[in-house]
């Protein structure tokens, strides 16, 4: 195993016991597992909830889907762990800036699944509906999705 990734602190225990890096999800565990911690995607729900609550109070709320991103502050990265090198930190910061600048572009082609089938042709951007209907593993990911 090269890296453990999951949203349970139990994964941190397993990563620590095995001495492998850990990338969490939805929770900052950087102080609990500093010797194996990489980072985690986290969510700041107030960026969504506060404007919606105000709209409800104002009588202007309209139902709809919300897909937050780094640009609106909804998606964040937890602190990078001490095992993350300076070179990697610089790459992460550059990629974060690129993601924010291209807010709304989550997947664009060319994109293939792990069987080599083209999912998105070069230059095409995935729609919200396509993202919500993802039922494949991308190129380079080993394994299969469960059937049924």
Model-derived segments and their meaning:
Residues 1-148:
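A residue-level marker of the well-folded mature domains of exported/periplasmic proteins
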């Amino acid at each position: 195993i090269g890296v453990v990734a999951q949203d349970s602190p139990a994964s941190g225990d397993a990563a620590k016991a095995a001495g492998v890096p850990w990338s969490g999800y939805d929770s900052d565990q950087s102080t609990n597992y500093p010797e194996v911690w990489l980072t985690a995607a986290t969510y700041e729900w107030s960026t969504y909830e506060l404007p919606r609550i105000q709209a409800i109070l104002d009588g202007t709320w309209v139902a709809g889907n919300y897909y937050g991103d780094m640009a609106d502050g909804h998606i964040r990265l937890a602190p990078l762990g001490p095992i993350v090198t300076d070179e990697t930190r610089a790459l992460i910061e550059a990629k974060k800036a690129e993601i924010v600048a291209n807010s709304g572009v989550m997947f664009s082609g060319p994109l293939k699944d792990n069987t080599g089938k083209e999912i998105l042709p070069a230059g095409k951007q995935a729609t919200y509906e396509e993202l919500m209907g993802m039922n494949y593993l991308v190129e380079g990911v080993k394994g299969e999705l469960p059937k049924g």
